[in-house]
């Protein structure tokens, strides 16, 4: 009985191998999908954020990543800005931590 099993296993042979070109093509397709779905949008967001950071000027109303809303009072060349939260409180933060530049008059509406 066991000799029939060994004959059946030997008759199936080795599984067919795919061509290496199909593997390379699949890797290229996955690389392109990764680039267009992840890297390209991230580069676009980074470029827009850098443009936003360069456009910050004195008097702009900004929203920080921490949720603070204030008016820019000073813009330093070393990457820091001073934000007045109210008449008495001023905070110095890195320019990179600005999440958005708000329309004029937003602070008065709050």
From Swiss-Prot:
Signal peptide feature range: none
Alphabetic keyword roster: Cell inner membrane, Cell membrane, Membrane, Protein transport, Translocation, Transmembrane, Transmembrane helix, Transport
Pfam families assigned to the protein according to its UniProt record, in alphabetical order: YajC
Compartmental location: Cell inner membrane
UniProt cross-references to InterPro entries, sorted A to Z: Preprotein_translocase_YajC
Main location: membrane
Keyword Cell membrane: yes
Annotated GO CC locations: cell envelope Sec protein transport complex; membrane; plasma membrane
Sequence intervals crossing the membrane: 19-39
GO BP annotation list: protein insertion into membrane from inner side; protein transport by the Sec complex
Keyword Transit peptide: no
Family annotation (SMART domains): YajC (SM01323)
Membrane topology: Single-pass membrane protein
Similarity comment: family membership: Belongs to the YajC family.
Subunit structure: Part of the SecDF-YidC-YajC translocase complex; YajC is also present in a homooligomeric complex in excess of the other components. The SecDF-YidC-YajC translocase forms a supercomplex with SecYEG, called the holo-translocon (HTL). The stoichiometry of the super complex may be SecYEG:YidC:SecDF 4:3:1, YajC is in the reconstituted complex (with SecDF) but as no antibody is available it could not be quantified.
Functional summary from the UniProt entry: The SecYEG-SecDF-YajC-YidC holo-translocon (HTL) protein secretase/insertase is a supercomplex required for protein secretion, insertion of proteins into membranes, and assembly of membrane protein complexes. The SecYEG complex is essential for assembly of a number of proteins and complexes, assembly is facilitated in the presence of the SecDF-YajC-YidC subcomplex.
Protein name: Sec translocon accessory complex subunit YajC
């Amino acid at each position: 009985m066991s000799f029939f099993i060994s004959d059946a296993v030997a008759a199936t042979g080795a599984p067919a191998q795919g061509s290496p070109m199909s593997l390379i093509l699949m890797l290229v397709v996955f690389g392109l999908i990764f680039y267009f779905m992840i890297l390209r949008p991230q580069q676009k967001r980074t470029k827009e954020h850098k443009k936003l950071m360069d456009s910050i000027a004195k008097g702009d109303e900004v929203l920080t990543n921490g949720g603070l809303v204030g008016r820019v009072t000073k813009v330093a060349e070393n990457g820091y800005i001073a934000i007045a939260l109210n008449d008495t409180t001023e905070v110095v933060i890195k320019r990179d931590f600005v999440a958005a530049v708000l329309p004029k008059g937003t602070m008065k509406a709050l």
